[in-house]
């Protein structure tokens, strides 16, 4: 046994001495069997757990003894003691292959650093689309689960750094070269290390030679308890956040439930941790020994303090994605410990903000992001972002070209990519116009282009997404076709010598063609004498005739079309070189002419009693020569021509009128001059021509029985349509009715009154209603009906002839009563209205229309001229007034006697051409109004709107000096509503006490208005009523400082009824001062006593008693305040307003009363609103329209409104007010079966008078109701017919006016 121990000790010693067989764990010399070493991967991130390690053992040493036996001993390497392997040493750990085959190097697993390494030093990374478009793939090994305690496993889309367990494979070396017979001994060695219990079991086989060979060595390890600090060295923690408590919970990632020392942890969770605070946790478990693991919990900031924000710019949103973490709240954590991480596809970025560019439009991209604090993730978010629409493609233009001078067309194919609409721009020189087109269009027609102009067209599609993106534009161009150029302008004609002219003009503003050429045509009369063309508009015309009128026409030619010529008239001068010879010749001729004239005067005086026809032959040759060549006027330029001729005090009208011979001497006048006929003529010089006089039937034994002062007059293309006659004298009344019977006339138009200005104008040739029937020779006349209207009187007569058995005939007698004593009617519409009435009674089977005034030439010719020319205007769309008046003079001398009548014909034609027929019968009103409101097409205004637009505004047509004076401006409530001077209501300072002085003052006209004191001004105007002019007053609502003037006006003008159409206030704004009070109130000299107040649902009636301080008598004034009418609106209940109007009319004087015929003395009605125009205008219009409807069963709303606008500014100023008048009248007079249904209060209004007034009067021989006083410029004395002395003899007419004053003749 002792020997055995020594042998064993000796073998152990040799083992230490044998350096060849000493093996360590890291031998630099490869084993004889070719053992290789594989280097393991690098250490993982600090956030990952440290790997488990395996202790490597050294191979056993083999000793051979000489005494033929061997022994195998296994010894531990000195390095295999209790030692913890550091991470650095693990990188160099070797792995051994026990099979003796060379090991293969372990492949390197992909890491975040392998896929994409972010650049350092920036918070934002930008990547191109080639990398961004890669598909997100899971990272291998990222989801591996470790069985080793303390290791963590976290599921994430992000790849984690791989951790490979470090393993060393040990291969034992054999140093004996011979195989000995086996002698086996079993030895077990147990060694305690820090890591494990090593149990070694060895079997020793002795060879026959006595050497011992170790054949097999088996080592078994039994694990011992590690320390808790070691076991949980790599423990990981997840932080869970509670948004309600704003506290964290730390979850310890271990497989067993551990204890946390002083801190309580439940299910491995530590609760109620505050953000950005540190907490220490001592971890222990019964599977490990002391010391415990001390874990420092570094709590991250709160999750709600971070927000993932889309920072993509909308302009780049089609190809760019931008994501950014924003800190929406502050925190105390160290921001350097925060890591932001994004993963988009297979790209990973550690940045707070990322931006991906060059992406595809309209694609979805997903990006995941997380935030780590000290390498511990505590929040994450995902975003799916769709890129915006991209810019559309470029459309393909098929063609673009000019279709005409003002039109072009472009067609195209739309782009392939999606878009919303097109934008088409067309550029002309420096001007650019763009318009949006619908996406479905592939063609567009361009209108209103400028001729012969190059247009560059640009067409692009656009799409409206987050912003509007325009696609590429397709371009094309074309040049429009040529068109006629515009007119040259600023043309001048100047004389360079007596017969030479220099003509210049400016180029046209629109040439519209390829070439430039100016042409000048020179005409003398109707003969073309020169035709020149130059490149510039500069002509020198020489060698013209002296003292000749020339017409110069200059126009521009663009190579394709001529322009409109600019026309000027100029005359050459006389030949100054022959001036002396001409003067000498003139003296001689003048002397001869003087001698001839003296001789003729002597001869005429000597032969005064000779036949007057011989005298006419002396001037016959001059009748036609003095006529002018006046062209007919087309309807389109009728108004412009009238304005041109009326300018400069009507100089052109006067020239035309004076060129017409008053009497054409070539037509003999014998019958009228015979002695037995001279007494039948009212005027000795107004006689009918023999060739067309009206011849009566002969009465046996009565010389001249076939004569009457009347002439046949041709109408427009209708021979003998009229008979123009003088007003019958008492001696010729029987002849007049004989003419009516024989000529089968059914209509008589009387354009005069029996007496005018205390002068007899015409005999009363019909019976009165009281008389009933009267015989005029053989003709018996019976009056059946008598109807009085404001401007005319219609009488229905029945005539029979005693000597004939024929039945009686109906004759309509129409007397126009509104022709003033002097001058002509101011409103030509009155004559158009008369014409409508006459034509309503005339028919195809009637004889000629008999028209007469006093002499049968002036007013008669005017009416016939208007009637005939209106027929021509309707038939040919042009009129030849001058030519027709010449024709009238050839058929009856002095027809259209004065220039004012000649102008009146033109005015009536202009009125008709501009405004047309606007009068409507009540029976036709409803279908008429229905058609007037139709829009055809819907885009155009309705006929009713067009009619309103034709209404003249009459702004500033008369002066408004008084109301605009500085001292009177404060008396106007509305500066836009100032009364015109011509019809304003003047006030007197004091009321004259005597009736005579009062009468004189009341009769004063407005002519002195301009000279009155400022205190005499009040904002009020006289308004034309239906029955007489200026019997109404339209006034503004009184101001506080004008209440006294308001009552003065009411007292001076004897107002009986006040109509108040306004409240006192509108909101907080005063619109009318309260001009009355309870009981008695004194305003200056006027005492106003409120006697009674009666309120109804529609209006309030107040009764005032007025007294003047210098008068004893009192007056009663009624005030009707209509309260259901808001400012600037229409009446809420029109029927209530109509009802009040009917009540008001009952308080006014009747139309035939003597009081109602006084002009300006009594204006019984005053209407006011806020400014005296808005509501007042509607009220006045309705009052006049109701009177017209009740009297004539017709309404003319257009003319009523036009008259109101002429009387006061702002009357019926809107279309809504205009249409309201139509609607109210239509609802007031409903139609049933084509007949107008009258209300009860109307039944007695529209009827013929069946009895004469008690005081005998010539119903048609008095002044017209309320004939207006004329302004000074209208009060011209007539130079017409003046009767001679004696009532029996004929009268004499001065042959027309000697000056261009506008006079009236007959």
Curated annotation (Swiss-Prot):
Which positions in this protein are listed as binding substrate? 821, 853-859, 897
Extracellular-side positions: 26-577
Tell me which residues this entry annotates as catalytic: 853 (phosphocysteine intermediate), 1169 (phosphocysteine intermediate)
Where are the annotated segments for Disordered? 28-163, 993-1014, 1261-1306
Using the UniProt record, give the first listed, main subcellular location: membrane
What are the Phosphotyrosine sites (modified residues) in this protein?
683
According to the UniProt entry, which residue ranges have a biased composition of type Polar residues? 52-61, 70-131
Residues in the Cytoplasmic compartment per record? 599-1306
Listed GO MF terms? ankyrin binding; heparan sulfate proteoglycan binding; heparin binding; protein kinase binding; protein tyrosine kinase inhibitor activity; protein tyrosine phosphatase activity; signaling receptor binding; spectrin binding
Q: What is the effect of changing residue 230 to A?
A: In a breast cancer sample; somatic mutation
**Transmembrane intervals:** 578-598
* Tissue/organ expression: Isoform 1: Detected in thymocytes. Isoform 2: Detected in thymocytes. Isoform 3: Detected in thymocytes. Isoform 4: Not detected in thymocytes. Isoform 5: Detected in thymocytes. Isoform 6: Not detected in thymocytes. Isoform 7: Detected in thymocytes. Isoform 8: Not detected in thymocytes.
Enzyme class of the recorded protein, top EC level = hydrolase
Q: How does it assemble?
A: Binds GANAB and PRKCSH. Interacts with SKAP1. Interacts with DPP4; the interaction is enhanced in an interleukin-12-dependent manner in activated lymphocytes. Interacts with CD53; this interaction stabilizes PTPRC on the membrane and is required for optimal phosphatase activity. (Microbial infection) Interacts with human cytomegalovirus protein UL11; the interaction is required for binding of UL11 to T-cells.
**Disease field:** Multiple sclerosis: A multifactorial, inflammatory, demyelinating disease of the central nervous system. Sclerotic lesions are characterized by perivascular infiltration of monocytes and lymphocytes and appear as indurated areas in pathologic specimens (sclerosis in plaques). The pathological mechanism is regarded as an autoimmune attack of the myelin sheath, mediated by both cellular and humoral immunity. Clinical manifestations include visual loss, extra-ocular movement disorders, paresthesias, loss of sensation, weakness, dysarthria, spasticity, ataxia and bladder dysfunction. Immunodeficiency 105, severe combined: An autosomal recessive disorder characterized by recurrent infections in early infancy, decreased or absent numbers of non-functional T cells, normal or increased levels of B cells, hypogammaglobulinemia, and normal or low NK cells. Clinical manifestations may include pneumonia, dermatitis, and lymphadenopathy.
Put simply, this protein is called: Receptor-type tyrosine-protein phosphatase C
């Amino acid at each position: 046994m002792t020997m055995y121990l020594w042998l064993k000790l000796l073998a152990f010693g040799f083992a230490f001495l044998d350096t060849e067989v000493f093996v360590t764990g890291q031998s630099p010399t490869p084993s004889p069997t070719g053992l290789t070493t594989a280097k393991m991967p690098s250490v993982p991130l600090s956030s990952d757990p440290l790997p488990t390690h395996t202790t490597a053992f050294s191979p056993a040493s083999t000793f051979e003894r000489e005494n033929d036996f061997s022994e195998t001993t296994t010894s531990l390497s000195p390095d295999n003691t209790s030692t913890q392997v550091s991470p650095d040493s693990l990188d160099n750990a070797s792995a051994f292959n026990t099979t003796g085959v060379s090991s293969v190097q372990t492949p390197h697993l992909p890491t975040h650093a392998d896929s994409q390494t972010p650049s350092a030093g920036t918070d934002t990374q930008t990547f191109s689309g080639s990398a961004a478009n890669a598909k997100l793939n899971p990272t291998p090994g990222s989801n591996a689960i470790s069985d080793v305690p303390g290791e963590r496993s976290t599921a994430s889309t992000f790849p984690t750094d791989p951790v490979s367990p470090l393993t060393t494979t040990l291969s034992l070396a054999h140093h004996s070269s011979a195989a000995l017979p086996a002698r086996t001994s079993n030895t077990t060695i147990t060694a305690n290390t820090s890591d494990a219990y090593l149990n070694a079991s060895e079997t020793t086989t002795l060879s026959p030679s006595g050497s011992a060979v170790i054949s097999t060595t088996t080592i078994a390890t039994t694990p011992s308890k590690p320390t808790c600090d070691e076991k949980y060295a790599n423990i990981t923690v997840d932080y869970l956040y509670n948004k309600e408590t704003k506290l964290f919970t730390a979850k310890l990632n271990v497989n067993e439930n551990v204890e946390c020392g002083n801190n309580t942890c439940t299910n491995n969770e530590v609760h109620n941790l505050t953000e950005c605070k540190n907490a220490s946790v001592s971890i222990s478990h019964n599977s490990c020994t002391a010391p415990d693991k001390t874990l420092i919990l570094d709590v991250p900031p709160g999750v709600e303090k971070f927000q993932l924000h889309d920072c993509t710019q909308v302009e780049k949103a089609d190809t760019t994605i931008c994501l950014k973490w924003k800190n929406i709240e502050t925190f105390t954590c160290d921001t350097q410990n925060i890591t932001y991480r994004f993963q988009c596809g297979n790209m990973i970025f550690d940045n707070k903000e990322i931006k991906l560019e060059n992406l595809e439009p309209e694609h979805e991209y997903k990006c995941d992001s997380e935030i780590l604090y000290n390498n511990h993730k505590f929040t994450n978010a995902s975003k799916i972002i769709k890129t915006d629409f991209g810019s559309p493609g470029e459309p393909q233009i098929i063609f673009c070209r000019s279709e005409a001078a003002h039109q072009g067309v472009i067609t195209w194919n739309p782009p392939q990519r999606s878009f919303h609409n097109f934008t088409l721009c067309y550029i002309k020189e420096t001007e650019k116009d763009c318009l949006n087109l619908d996406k479905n269009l592939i063609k567009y027609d361009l209108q209103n282009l400028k001729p012969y102009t190059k247009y560059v067209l640009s067409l692009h599609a656009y799409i409206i997404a987050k912003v509007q993106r325009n696609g590429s534009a397709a371009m094309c161009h074309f040049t429009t076709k040529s068109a006629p150029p515009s007119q040259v302008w600023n043309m001048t004609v100047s004389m360079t010598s007596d017969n030479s002219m220099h003509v210049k003009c400016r180029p046209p503003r629109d040439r519209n063609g390829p070439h430039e050429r100016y042409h000048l045509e020179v005409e003398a009369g109707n003969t073309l004498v020169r035709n020149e063309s130059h490149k510039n508009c500069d002509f020198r015309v020489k060698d013209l005739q002296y003292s000749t009128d020339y017409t110069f026409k200059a126009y521009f030619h663009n190579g394709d079309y001529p322009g409109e010529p600019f026309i000027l008239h100029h005359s050459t001068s006389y030949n100054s070189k022959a001036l002396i010879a001409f003067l000498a010749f003139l003296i001689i001729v003048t002397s001869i002419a003087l001698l001839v004239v003296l001789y003729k005067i002597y001869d005429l005086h000597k032969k005064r009693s000779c036949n007057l026809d011989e005298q006419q032959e002396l001037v016959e040759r001059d009748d036609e020569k003095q006529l002018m060549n006046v062209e007919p006027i087309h309807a389109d330029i009728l108004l412009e021509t009238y304005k041109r001729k009326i300018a400069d005090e009507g100089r052109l009208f006067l020239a035309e009128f004076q060129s017409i011979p008053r009497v054409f001497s070539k037509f003999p006048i014998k019958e009228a001059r015979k002695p037995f006929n001279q007494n039948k003529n009212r005027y000795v010089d107004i006689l009918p021509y023999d060739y067309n006089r009206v011849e009566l039937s002969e009465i046996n034994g009565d010389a001249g029985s076939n004569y009457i002062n009347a002439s046949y007059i041709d109408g427009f293309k209708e021979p003998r349509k009229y008979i123009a006659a003088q007003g019958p004298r008492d001696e010729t009344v029987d002849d007049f009715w004989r003419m009516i019977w024989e000529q089968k006339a059914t209509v008589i138009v009387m354009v005069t009154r029996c007496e005018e200005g205390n002068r007899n104008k015409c005999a009363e040739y019909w019976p009165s209603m009281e008389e009933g029937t009267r015989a005029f020779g053989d003709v018996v006349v019976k009056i059946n009906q008598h109807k009085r209207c404001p401007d005319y009187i219609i009488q229905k007569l029945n005539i029979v002839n005693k000597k004939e058995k024929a039945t009686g005939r109906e004759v309509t007698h129409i007397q126009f009563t509104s022709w003033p004593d002097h001058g002509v009617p101011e409103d030509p519409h009155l004559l158009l209205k008369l014409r409508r009435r006459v034509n309503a009674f005339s028919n195809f089977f009637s004889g000629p229309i008999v028209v007469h005034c006093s002499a049968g030439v002036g007013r008669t010719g005017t009416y016939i001229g208007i009637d005939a020319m209106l027929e021509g205007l309707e038939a040919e769309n042009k009129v030849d007034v001058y030519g027709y008046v010449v024709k009238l003079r050839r058929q009856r001398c002095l027809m259209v006697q004065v220039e004012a009548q000649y102008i009146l014909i033109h005015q009536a034609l202009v009125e008709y051409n501009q405004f047309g027929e606007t009068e409507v019968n009540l029976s036709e009103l409803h279908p008429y109004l229905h058609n007037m409101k139709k829009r055809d097409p819907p885009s155009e205004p309705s006929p009713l709107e067009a009619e309103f637009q034709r209404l003249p505004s009459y702004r500033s047509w008369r002066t408004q000096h008084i109301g605009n004076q500085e001292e009177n401006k404060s008396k106007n409530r509305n500066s836009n509503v100032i009364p015109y001077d011509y019809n304003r209501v003047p006030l007197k300072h004091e009321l004259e006490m005597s009736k005579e002085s009062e009468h004189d003052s009341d009769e004063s006209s407005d002519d002195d208005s301009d000279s009155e004191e400022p205190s005499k001004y009040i904002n009020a105007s006289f308004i034309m009523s239906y029955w007489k002019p200026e019997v109404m007053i339209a006034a503004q609502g009184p101001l506080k400082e004008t209440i006294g003037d308001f009552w003065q006006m009411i007292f001076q003008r004897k107002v009986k009824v006040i109509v108040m159409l306004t409240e006192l206030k509108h909101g907080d704004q005063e619109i009318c001062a309260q001009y009355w009070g309870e009981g008695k109130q004194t305003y200056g000299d006027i005492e106003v006593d409120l006697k009674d107040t009666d309120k109804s649902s529609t209006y309030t009636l107040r009764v005032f008693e007025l007294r003047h301080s210098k008068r004893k008598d009192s007056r009663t004034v009624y005030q009707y305040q209509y309260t259901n009418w808001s400012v600037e609106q229409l009446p809420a209940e029109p029927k209530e307003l109509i009802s009040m109007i009917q009540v008001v009319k009952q308080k006014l004087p009747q139309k035939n009363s003597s009081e109602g015929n006084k002009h300006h003395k009594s204006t019984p009605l005053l209407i006011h609103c806020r400014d005296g125009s808005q509501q007042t205008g509607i009220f006045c219009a309705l009052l006049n329209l109701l009177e017209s409807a009740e009297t004539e069963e017709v309404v003319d709303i257009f003319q009523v409104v036009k008259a109101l606008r002429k009387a006061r500014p702002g009357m019926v100023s809107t279309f809504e007010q205009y249409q309201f008048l139509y609607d109210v009248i239509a609802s007031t007079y409903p139609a049933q079966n084509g007949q107008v249904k009258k209300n009860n209060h109307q039944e007695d209004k529209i009827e013929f008078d069946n009895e004469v007034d008690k005081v005998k009067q010539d119903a048609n021989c008095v002044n017209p109701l309320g004939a207006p006083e004329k302004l000074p410029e209208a009060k011209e004395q007539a130079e017409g017919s003046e009767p001679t002395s004696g009532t029996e003899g004929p009268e004499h007419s001065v042959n027309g006016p000697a000056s261009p004053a506008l006079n009236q003749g007959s």
